[in-house]
Amino acid sequence: MTSYSFTEKKRIRKDFGKQRSILEVPFLLAIQVDSYREFLQEDVEPNKRKDLGLHAALKSVFPISSYSGNAALEYVGYKLGQPVFDERECRQRGMSYGAPLRVTVRLVIYDRESSTKAIKYVKEQEVYLGEIPLMTGNGTFIVNGTERVIVSQLHRSPGVFFDHDRGKTHSSGKLLYSARIIPYRGSWLDFEFDPKDALFTRIDRRRKLPVSILLRALGYSNEEMLAEFFEINTFHINPDEGVQLELVPERLRGETLNFDLADGDKVIVEAGKRITARHVKQLEAAGVAALAVPDDYLVGRILSHDVVDGSTGELLANANDEINEDQLAAFRKAGVDAVGTLWVNDLDRGPYLSNTLRIDPTKTQLEALVEIYRMMRPGEPPTKEAAQNLFHNLFFTFERYDLSTVGRMKFNRRVGRKDVLGESVLYDKKYFAERNDEESKRLVAEHADTSDILEVIKVLTEIRNGRGVVDDIDHLGNRRVRSVGEMAENVFRVGLVRVERAVKERLSMAESEGLTPQELINAKPVAAAIKEFFGSSQLSQFMDQNNPLSEVTHKRRVSALGPGGLTRERAGFEVRDVHPTHYGRVCTIETPEGPNIGLINSLAVFARTNQYGFLETPYRKVLDGKVSDDVEYLSAIEENEYVIAQANALTDAKNMLTEQFVPCRFQGESLLKPPSEVHFMDVSPMQTVSVAAALVPFLEHDDANRALMGANMQRQAVPTLRSQKPLVGTGIERAVARDSGVTVNALRGGVIEQIDAARIVVKVNEAEIGGGTDAGVDIYNLIKYTRSNQNTCINQRPLVNVGDVIARGDVLADGPSTDIGELALGQNMLIAFMPWNGYNFEDSILLSERVVEEDRYTTIHIEELTCVARDTKLGPEEISADIPNVSEQALNRLDESGVVYIGAEVRAGDIMVGKVTPKGESQLTPEEKLLRAIFGEKASDVKDSSLRVPPGMDGTVIDVQVFTRDGIEKDKRARQIEESEIKRVKKDFDDQFRILEAAIYARLRSQIVGKVANGGANLKKGDTVTDAYLDGLKKSDWFQLRMKDEDAADAIERAQKQIQAHEKEFEARFADKRGKITQGDDLAPGVLKMVKVFLAVKRRIQPGDKMAGRHGNKGVVSNVVPVEDMPYMATGESVDIVLNPLGVPSRMNIGQILEVHLGWAAKGLGRKIQRMLEAQAAVSELRKFLNDIYNHDNAINAQRVDLSQFSDEELLNLGKNLIDGVPMATPVFDGASEAEIKRMLELADLPQSGQTQLYDGRTGEAFDRKTTVGYMHYLKLNHLVDDKMHARSTGPYSLVTQQPLGGKAQFGGQRFGEMEVWALEAYGAAYTLQEMLTVKSDDVQGRNQMYKNIVDGEHEMVAGMPESFNVLVKEIRSLAINMELEE
């Protein structure tokens, strides 16, 4: 049985799961956090760092040598500094959170004169290489003040892949096979067949060349190529007539001979008959070694070697020639004894390479190299050196080509080698044996006679011959995950390579001019590459911060898009489809609807990546039908060999599989196997789904399409004012809330010392206090009312009280959408399924007014508005309250600096920050001239450019931040903000110090009370120190005590030192903070001052808002009805929401109905507990009832709740927390059965049918039949009508067409499109149509005139020429057709 933590004891979920949990839900952000930790290797000592991340990138680029080789720059190590600003300061100031990277490099200069490369001198130095972004504890990055997430990428693994064109290339439908070697970086190498069965190669998808050119470039001759790919038949030529064949019987199979095949006198095969496997066996039994065949049997065969006249040295025939009768005669004449021919046939030994050699124009290695050079660099004149270098650099140098460990492992496995290790370049025995540099010699020594390129071609020809299969590129063994760390490393390497080029140039000057490493290295390219990646890469995304679940899901997302991946347009159906290998690795449900469907996936709950980046999923081992608790992670490649049972396979008490045949998966198929043949078993029923899908209760009763919508819409739920835990959950709510990082969890156990709304102070347990200056106090500052990326409100509320004893990991404070440490996305609403006057037609939702009154779905949104004062050509803009032509009333919310007060309630159009801009001299109107004459000059030289509240927004100002450029005097408001911030920090530090001091004195007291003193204030020698004496003593005088006991004396001295050390440390930290607060801000060029105003907007639920359950049952609120009109139950309780029952059957999401039944039972049980508490029943009675709920029929110990762990007080506290309903957990695919739901309804004294009689609120009459009623967890989604509703008055126009812009952001109009024009034409409403097409759109004069007419009170219009017609005329003129309009 589990023991419960302090938080969990407050409220326990009843679990309906039948399966024992073998594995806890892992840390959900591990894929991000671990990946980046390996990239930085920050806490690893420099000499122990693995070949990963920054270290690997630096090692691969250094050492850099000069062109002459007389100077080199070597890499020693690196270290990361401390970040200047912490996360909170970066968010506030709009900076990036990162740390400086300092790399130690060594400049070595060699002596030119010496022949042995003697070192002249060495200089070692630290070089700054830019800022490296740091990851926050929650797996995000702060870039320019906003939180971003780097999404992992699922890309095609490096290695070799075999495929065919599915018969699409050639009209005959013939399958053309191809192979492709994909490196991690470097050129792709393709091999492909053409319809005539010749074999070609392509480099980097360029034009194709016969494959023999590539082999010739490697150094192979025709004879060697043929010997590699074909077996050889040897024929002995008789001097006069006939030929003897050295017989290998197997090679005759399938042939038809035109002569009898006999063993001595016995004919085995008659002429004209096909030779079968039976004949072959007979031949083998007979032991026939040679076969006499006629000459015409040899004619037409292909020679495997050149044939030379032994006496004269004359070439009689070339390898790969077809033997003709003349040649045969020449062989006889020259006395050639034997010739070799290629063994080919049409069945399974195609003459592919032989065909290829016939179309190959080259004869020598040099010609082949030149041909490749021409293909890669068309138009450049080839030289021998250039051609050789180009070819070598393509596949054989570590700088340009890298298969990577993954690629090498996949390559070796695919071509059938046992060893998974090897070189990261392509190796070829022939090519490297001919080179004589050190690197080549090493390779030849290590790998002897293997050849990567030859083996790929061999496997390809085998597949073409019908032996072997092509690969499935959507198999997860062929796709790997690239996470943050790896992508950052690649980008960093790219930056370093750019630096390398510049350094090489300068190194030659280094020795003559005595340059230092710092002068050699320019860090800009590295910094720029990293900044570009984190700021604007396709995979660096603005974090979805709607609620905790959306954050977690965003970080666990796996995308097939992005650099080096697919594009939406090119991706076909196969890539997007669910593949059998997705099981337990990638969620089969959660993916976006729309163009990205299937390209963006989510990791399954238990999935993780292995060292190669392939996804693995855990399984329990099964031995001879016995299931163990040993867990093994398998990748898709390894899983192929095993038979795997489902998590719910039946087992007995001894963990033996009980069924005669167990449902299993094997190689992507589902089948039944006896227990003895099962190797593994799933760990958990929710293994296949992602976090979001695992939060949907009764998911197993929902159609997959609706489950997908349900999983996706949970991510859009807006955090409500008061979160409510779901009555029906799945049991992983706590894990999601914990790992999302929105709650505050205790880092160490202890006692709550002090608490207020904004922070919690914990005095740490003695046992957990570290040594040194650790004083054993943890201070947690809570986040109050800050804005998320999606403008929702992030706020944390304390859950503990002073004196509570907490353990490590306990939840101290709730964040948005969490309730006592559990994820709580919506509210539990009483729902009835019935039509109601057409107000819930087509998925509309009918709400009760009570929901609005109780603020159940009221959400707070925080809008950030920014006002920037710039330096303009005509002078600086100024932020002030002195604005021309504005009434006093409009300024009454501003202070003397022109900035709005905190707490002011503002509406659309109100001034928030007063700002004036100098304006140039312009033509004055007569009225302005008059004003000038009367009032003098001042009125006209500035214009009002204040920040106003945008249309459609109103709210309360909750925060103002003023940023001032360095060297510009701060205004009064900025100084006030600064002072209050300094005060806050000072109070924080003072409190910390006070608590630390108290803790130190308390420890000291325990060490000296009762000990004998030698002297001190008012103490004689030999007196004993007492508590009362210490209480009367000033704290600072404690250190005057002289103790007899040495330990006590030491304790006093130690305490004094500790306090002094802390005092110093706090002073230094406070000075640092103060400096940061008072320093000027780093603003964009030309900006003098920036003011940010934060508005809190309260949004109540209203018609037009989108809501949804967790089963894809979404709808729009159609009406809010008074409570008294809503249907009500016999108890008088009216329902909150009425949904249409027709939304259920066709969509097949029955999970919502089961949720409603179980939710009703949960609420009913809560009501019973409430009645018990109100009647002040005995605790034993409550204990018995809770035991009935939690432990009635649970066979599995894991879910039994051991109520004996709870004291009476804790039990009453638990009871109080259950009044709102007893939360239930029905895990995915392992949930509550119908019988269990019925039992719960019975226990709650509710009808087992889950239906009850409702009465019409308006008439009081009973409805015709009973209605399904119950509680459902219902969400309000972030698609609010307030954000979408919009109306244009007068706004901006498009520059060219002069038509109004579109969209709310541009304050645009509504498009009157072609269909609407047709409608008016059909009605014959000519004048309305003219008005729409001219003055209401783009007739500039007409619309100005109309405006004037309306001002003058004349309501008439004159339509002129629309601007778009002028555009048309201009476009026609651009085609050189003149068009003029005549009156």
Curated annotation (Swiss-Prot):
Catalytic activity: RNA(n) + a ribonucleoside 5'-triphosphate = RNA(n+1) + diphosphate
Any one Gene Ontology cellular component term annotated for this protein: DNA-directed RNA polymerase complex
Annotated Pfam families: RNA_pol_Rpb2_1, RNA_pol_Rpb2_2, RNA_pol_Rpb2_3, RNA_pol_Rpb2_45, RNA_pol_Rpb2_6, RNA_pol_Rpb2_7
Enzyme class: transferase
One Gene Ontology molecular-function label: DNA-directed RNA polymerase activity
UniProt superkingdom: Bacteria
EC number: 2.7.7.6
Alphabetical keyword list: DNA-directed RNA polymerase, Nucleotidyltransferase, Transcription, Transferase
Listed GO biological process terms: DNA-templated transcription
Membership in a protein family: Belongs to the RNA polymerase beta chain family.
Function: DNA-dependent RNA polymerase catalyzes the transcription of DNA into RNA using the four ribonucleoside triphosphates as substrates.
Protein name: DNA-directed RNA polymerase subunit beta
Organism listed in the record: Xanthomonas axonopodis pv. citri (strain 306)
Name of encoding gene: rpoB
